[in-house]
């Protein structure tokens, strides 16, 4: 459901009897009883106009087919104290976010899939795929996060639940997330020409301080906006809520003997797993600027620029190597572009044409410094650096055109739209190693993991919205995508491969032209929906939609061999595909609205790493004779293959009830509830761990008659994952030198999955006409639980997934305990 302003104002007030109350809890509760500070009559008249303008934006949206679809606006982000991608989906039981440790998040999980199988785009330009193979994830040296724009710069975030490649292209297997940056109109009230804000905030779950400002202006000829945000924070705390300690970023810090790293009741310690999150400190700066020039009544020329950079420093205590490890990582976005909007005044056919040219560069740098103890001293020195920058460049031209409604005698009214894009991308990954001896000069070299890859991407989509009768309407869409992969060896690639032995299998592949193979692939997909009004209040809807995911460049071209494991390229991969069915019943009454949706999604041609044992010749050079010495070896061959099918199905219920008249109050009171139930299975007998267990949200909200204060609270039910829904395949051997076999069994930590009830209370109060205080207490009753997304991440090899054989490390993955946020905003 696209959430409107009433949907956000949700409150559930639990009993506080017998519970300790923090100062902030009292502050938030007090907001409900404070009287409004008087404004002038003119200012009071302006506020409802601004509120109604926001509602109008929602009303212009097409009715959502699936109740799981969700729209977050800048107002929602501000009112709900949203600071991160996890906050965006806090109350959406369909969608979740998985951590990527020191690298941020792994993107969103929707309909049982996550990572690259959920498409992300910023202002219509795709954000790059994660390019890390499972074989390298265990070491933690590769940048594994997916880029996420800072929420402070966003006007809207739209979540589409279910296959959505018609709108979002590659990756929208389970759904998509579209980020739209702010425009001047987001900061300017309807009756003014200048607007802006200054904002400061604090969150104690990660000790983040944030400061932001925005300024926008407009007249008949020009519109402009500039928006800036700065954040400083630390690792997200677990249930213990221990404060950040900067000393823990010292590579010499003694975690083993720190009393915080043992259980108070048992005194148990572990040197293979921590019970607190790894220490981390980060700084984010982001800036948005836009300028629009109205050339005449029909034409507008625009310029836009976005820049964002996050620097992180972390001490990776939970590692798989002996040496102390400090991560110094960077995620950076640079985006620039020009746009043109054409709104013809006299045309009887064209409604609007938008053309945009954008250049986007996203860089993810994983820098890992390893340290060793100085002999006879307590100090540590840097003995090595692993430098892993990934760079993704995109230049994209997009054209969108929409027609006015075209009336026909027998086939109803048709509204046509065409959307076409052409993009050129360039992906580069560098592996640089530096060894720093205690004396002498450092030495550096490059390792080869695969070529750089350019892509030419073209797509065109055509849609027809048909209003057949007053009761029946339908939408039909068809889309074509074409991908052309072009691998190439840059100078660093050549240096890396040419330093290897001439008998190194990957070098032999290079010399035989294995990395010169271009690859073309295409996909045809679409969508179909039909809506029928059963009565003035009830409507039934059916939607069919398709999704696909073009293989990541790393899946097609990565190559590496080490310790009997050989990762081989595969240019014969096909796109993954999905087919989604949804059937909904929705009702819209005077004070009540609801939607019930049943869904079924079929996934095919899943790409996974396939293991196989082969006996192959391996050679090395006898330096005394210069001749090769060869012998047969058992090699574990790893290659990405289209080997999997899966399906997910379930039910989503949601509704909003306006009880203001029933309660006989002058303000607005709404009750809302959402529930999501989903199951899945694969053709291998395993499960899609990204499928969420039973989740539900119940809320009750109040907003004062003058719109000058509101109080909200939610109760979230987070269900446990059952063993029969969490089966995984693991490689096991019956003994030394025995072959490994796939064994399917419940995930080994499934017993740690427990259900939980989590209460949140938050609100805001206008302190005059321009100043607003916002505050919230989250996990009010200090529930201790491990979110399913945290627990399932342990099923994947990762530097941050260290849990010892007694399960002690699970403690580290608990959600934050009782925590609070507070913010102060001055708007003008």
Label every model-predicted segment.
Residues 146-197, 827:
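A beta-strand signature from Gram-negative outer-membrane beta-barrel systems
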Residues 548, 599-605, 609-611, 717-733, ...:
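C-terminal beta-signal and adjacent terminal beta-strands/loops
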Residues 320, 326-346, 449-457, 512-525, ...:
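Outer-membrane beta-barrel signature, preferentially recognizing the C-terminal barrel domain
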Residues 204-311, 332-336, 410, 468, ...:
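Transmembrane beta-barrel wall of Gram-negative outer-membrane proteins
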């Amino acid at each position: 459901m696209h959430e409107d302003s009433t949907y956000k104002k949700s409150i559930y007030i639990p009993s506080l009897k017998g519970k300790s109350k923090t100062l902030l809890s009292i502050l938030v509760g007090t907001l409900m009883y404070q009287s409004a500070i008087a404004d002038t009559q003119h200012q009071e008249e302006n506020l409802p106009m601004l509120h109604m303008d926001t509602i109008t934006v929602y009303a212009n949206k097409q009715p959502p087919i699936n109740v799981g679809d969700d729209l977050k606006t800048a107002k929602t982000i501000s009112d709900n104290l949203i600071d991160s991608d996890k906050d965006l989906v806090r109350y959406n039981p369909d969608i979740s976010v998985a951590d990527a440790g020191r690298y941020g998040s792994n993107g969103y999980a929707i309909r049982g899939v996550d990572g690259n199988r959920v498409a992300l785009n910023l202002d219509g330009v795709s954000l790059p795929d994660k390019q890390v193979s499972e074989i390298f994830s265990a070491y933690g040296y590769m940048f594994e996060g997916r880029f996420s724009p800072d929420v402070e710069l966003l006007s809207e975030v739209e979540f589409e639940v279910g296959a959505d490649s018609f709108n979002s292209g590659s990756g929208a297997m389970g759904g998509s997330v579209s980020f739209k940056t702010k425009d001047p109109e987001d900061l300017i009230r309807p009756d003014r020409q200048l607007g802006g804000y200054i904002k400061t905030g604090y969150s104690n779950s990660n000790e983040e301080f944030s400061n932001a400002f925005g300024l926008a202006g407009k007249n008949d000829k020009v519109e402009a906006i500039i928006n800036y945000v700065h954040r400083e924070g630390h690792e997200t705390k677990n249930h213990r809520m221990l404060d950040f300690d900067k000393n823990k970023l010292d590579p010499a810090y003694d975690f083993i003997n720190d009393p915080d790293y043992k259980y108070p009741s048992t005194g148990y310690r572990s040197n293979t797993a921590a019970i607190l999150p790894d220490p981390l400190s980060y700084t984010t700066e982001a800036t948005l600027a836009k300028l629009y020039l109205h050339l005449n009544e029909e034409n507008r020329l625009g310029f836009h620029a976005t820049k964002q950079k996050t620097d992180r420093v972390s001490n990776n205590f939970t590692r798989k190597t002996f040496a102390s490890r400090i991560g110094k990582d960077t995620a950076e976005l640079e985006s620039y572009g020009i746009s043109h909007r054409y709104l013809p005044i006299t045309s009887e056919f064209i409604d609007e044409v938008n053309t945009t040219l954008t250049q986007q560069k996203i860089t993810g740098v994983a820098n890992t410094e390893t340290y060793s103890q100085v002999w006879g001293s307590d100090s540590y020195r840097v003995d090595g650096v692993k430098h892993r920058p990934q760079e993704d460049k995109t230049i994209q031209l997009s054209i969108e055109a929409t027609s006015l409604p075209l009336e026909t005698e027998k086939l109803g009214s048709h509204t046509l739209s065409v959307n076409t894009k052409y993009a050129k991308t360039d992906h580069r990954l560098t592996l640089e190693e530096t060894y720093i001896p205690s004396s002498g000069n450092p030495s550096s070299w490059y390792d080869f993991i695969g070529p750089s890859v350019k892509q030419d991407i073209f797509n065109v989509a055509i849609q027809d919205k048909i209003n057949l009768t007053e009761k029946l309407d339908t939408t039909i869409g068809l889309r074509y995508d074409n991908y052309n992969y072009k691998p190439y060896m840059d100078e660093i690639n050549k240096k890396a491969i040419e330093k290897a032995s001439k008998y190194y299998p990957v070098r032999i592949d290079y010399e035989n032209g294995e990395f010169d193979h271009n690859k073309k692939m295409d996909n045809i997909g679409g969508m179909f929906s039909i809506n029928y009004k059963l009565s003035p209040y009830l409507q039934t809807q059916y939607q069919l939609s398709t999704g696909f995911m073009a293989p990541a460049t790393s899946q097609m071209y990565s190559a590496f061999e080490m310790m009997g494991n050989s990762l081989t390229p595969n240019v014969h991969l096909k796109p993954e595909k999905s087919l989604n069915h949804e059937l909904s019943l929705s009702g819209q009454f005077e004070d009540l609205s609801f939607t019930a949706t049943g869904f079924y999604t079929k996934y095919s041609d899943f790409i996974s790493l396939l293991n196989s044992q082969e006996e192959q010749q391996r050679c090395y050079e006898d330096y005394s004779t210069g001749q090769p010495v060869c012998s047969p070896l058992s090699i574990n061959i790893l290659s990405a293959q289209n080997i999997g099918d899966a399906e997910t199905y379930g039910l989503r219920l949601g509704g909003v009830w306006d009880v203001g008249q029933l309660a006989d109050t002058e303000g607005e009171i709404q009750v809302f509830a959402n529930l999501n139930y989903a199951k899945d299975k694969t053709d291998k007998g395993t499960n899609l761990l990204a499928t969420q267990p039973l989740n539900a949200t119940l809320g009750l909200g109040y907003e004062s008659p003058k719109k000058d204060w509101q109080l909200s609270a939610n109760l979230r039910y987070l269900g446990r994952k059952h063993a029969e829904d969490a089966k995984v395949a693991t490689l096991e051997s019956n003994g030394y030198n025995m072959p490994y076999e796939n064994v399917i069994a419940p995930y080994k930590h499934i017993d740690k999955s427990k259900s939980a009830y989590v209460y949140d209370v938050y609100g805001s109060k206008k302190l005059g006409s321009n100043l607003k205080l916002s505050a919230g207490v989250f996990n009010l009753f200090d529930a201790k639980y491990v979110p399913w997304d945290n627990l399932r991440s342990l099923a994947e090899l990762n530097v941050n997934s260290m849990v010892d054989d007694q399960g002690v490390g699970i403690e580290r993955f608990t959600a934050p305990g009782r925590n609070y946020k507070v913010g102060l905003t001055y708007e003008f």
